[in-house]
C-alpha cells in the first residue's frame, strides 16, 4: 500500500496552465503529474485566466494587482495561496522557478519544500547572489534542476562539494 502524501505544486504566477496557452514549466508539470504515483493527492496551483486547464487537479489563485507598481504580485500570490489552502496541511510543497515564493511561504507554512529550477537561477530574484543560493541550500529540503546547465549556473561561485548536499 502506498503512503498517502499530500502535495501542492505551485507554478510561477505568470505561467499559463491551459491547453491553448501552456508554457514550458506548465507542460513539464503536467507531464510529470501524469506519471506520478501521488497524482490523486497532488494539487497544482497557479494564476491562469483561461478555463481549459491541462489537468483536473488545477486550482486557480487570483491576483488582483498583477500589473501594480505599488504592490508585490509575489506577496499577493503567496498570501492568496495561504488563504486558499489554510486547512490543507500539505506534506510537500513544490515550487517552480520562484525562490521568492519559497522565502515567503517558509515563514508561514510548516511543510517540506522542494524547489524546481527550470531556468537560469542567476536571473531570478531570490537566487541571484551566492548568499541567496547558500541560504536556499540550507533551508530547502530538496532542489531539483531540470538540466545540468541550470545546476551548473546555480553552483556558479559556490563550492562544488555542495552539489551533493
Name each model-derived stretch.
Residues 50, 99-101, 149-151:
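Alpha-helix capping/helix-boundary segments
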Residues 95-100, 117:
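Short His-centered aromatic/hydrophobic patch
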Residues 2-7:
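Extreme N-terminal starter segment of soluble prokaryotic enzymes
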Residues 31, 82-83, 126-143:
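Membrane-proximal helix-turn-helix segments that form the acceptor-binding/catalytic region
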Residues 11-19, 31-72:
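N-terminal strand-loop element at the rim of the active site
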Residues 67-92, 128:
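An amphipathic, basic-hydrophobic alpha-helix
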Residues 134, 140-164:
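A short, active-site helix/loop in glycosyltransferases that binds the activated sugar's phosphate group
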Amino acid at each position: 500500500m502506498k503512503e498517502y502524501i499530500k502535495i501542492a505544486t505551485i507554478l510561477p504566477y505568470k505561467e499559463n496552465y491551459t491547453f491553448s496557452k501552456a508554457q514550458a514549466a506548465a507542460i513539464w508539470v503536467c507531464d510529470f503529474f501524469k506519471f506520478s504515483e501521488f497524482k490523486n493527492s497532488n494539487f497544482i496551483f497557479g494564476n491562469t485566466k483561461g478555463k481549459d486547464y491541462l489537468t483536473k487537479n488545477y486550482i486557480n489563485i487570483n491576483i488582483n494587482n498583477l500589473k501594480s507598481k505599488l504592490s508585490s504580485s509575489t506577496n499577493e500570490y503567496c498570501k492568496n495561496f495561504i488563504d486558499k489552502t489554510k486547512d490543507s496541511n500539505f506534506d510537500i510543497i513544490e515550487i517552480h522557478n520562484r525562490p521568492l515564493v519559497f522565502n515567503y511561504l517558509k515563514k508561514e507554512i510548516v511543510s517540506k519544500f522542494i524547489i524546481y529550477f527550470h531556468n537560469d537561477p542567476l536571473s531570478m530574484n531570490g537566487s541571484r547572489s551566492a548568499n541567496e543560493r547558500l541560504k536556499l541550500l540550507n533551508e530547502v529540503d530538496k532542489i531539483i534542476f531540470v538540466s545540468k546547465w541550470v545546476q551548473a549556473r546555480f553552483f556558479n561561485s559556490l563550492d562544488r562539494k555542495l552539489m551533493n548536499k
